[in-house]
Amino acid sequence: MTIAGRNKVVAFSIVLSALLCSISLLQAAFVLSGGSLPQLAVARVPPLLHTTGRAFMHVLTFLLPEAAARSLAAVSTAPSNSSTLVAILGTGLSAPLLLTYLLRRFEKTHAVEISYFSLFLCALNFEGVRLFLPILYTGTLTTYAGNVPMQIVMFFRSLALLALFASGIFAKKTLTRQEGAVVFVLCTVAFLISRYTTIHTIHAYRPSQSTQGAILLAQPISESGSIIDSTGEEKTLKVRSSAHRKTRILVTPQRNFTFYYGSHAWHRWFFWTTAVLSALSYGVLGHTLQISHYYIAAAALPFVIAGYRLLTHGLTWSACIVGLFLLNTASVFFIRSVHRVHIWQ
């Protein structure tokens, strides 16, 4: 791809990102005005958010008086669907801004890495598809209404992570300069991942626990991964626990767009495996070519993915704030370091 062709694609991505961001803002306004934002009934916060919340509280304690820091930390680390809404909108707003910065930096510079990184940034906008879930919810949530939007989201999440991984793998290979073919392969793999990832659209409650102890099933209920008949009434199903023992649990339809994920363990490992392999690929590039700026890019990529991971949860205000900070700051460092590589050459 030539510089002029790449610039046209990035410019189109900026326009598309701005359009998708505008649609997300309209969706958010519709959700808030119609009272469709669901109440969060789950207090089980993932380990990454626990760690982020504790770090955020230490920062607040250092900056503010102890009483004010504790009260603010209690609000910022409590699960909230409002923070999820802001995380979705913030992710969509970050994409066109970072793409504009990328285009200005590389307007006259050719870099294969940046072509794939722009694909990553463009894919971030499709987190806004999650806003269709509270809009589609009308008292009962069918399998189709819940699964289709989240399969779209999972496709673009997978494509974004694979694009980051490909940016380091294909940076210096002459044979893989056919970026269109590589992107097609990445889209195919991302589609297969999203198609066969189990999407859960229900809550599961153990009878001995209250609503505050709600958990998400890690095992599929059916072949499609969700309840076939969602009537709004509690149902009793039999599933296998981690110890391979059948356990009776109460199941209620899920209406919280925060938790429309696939299998959590797979989702988590996919993010962190991509982070490690992406950093390793740029580290190998830096060692092979003896260019120190590639080491900076390698160090920035795990923080980019960590910020993205926090924003996909967006479960607390601390996760939302830290995620936006990491995503934008690390992306700027990555773009600047790759730009210095090609200016130096």
Swiss-Prot record:
Residue ranges annotated as coiled coil are: none
The protein's superkingdom reads Bacteria
Q: What keywords appear on the UniProt entry?
A: Cell membrane, Membrane, Transmembrane, Transmembrane helix
Subcellular location(s): the record lists: Cell membrane
Show the disulfide pairing: none
Q: How does it sit in the membrane?
A: Multi-pass membrane protein
Gene Ontology cellular-component terms for this entry are:
plasma membrane
Membrane-spanning intervals of the chain: 9-31, 84-103, 116-138, 148-170, 182-204, 269-286, 291-308, 313-335
Protein name, UniProt field: Uncharacterized protein TP_1003
Organism taxonomic ancestry: Bacteria, Pseudomonadati, Spirochaetota, Spirochaetia, Spirochaetales
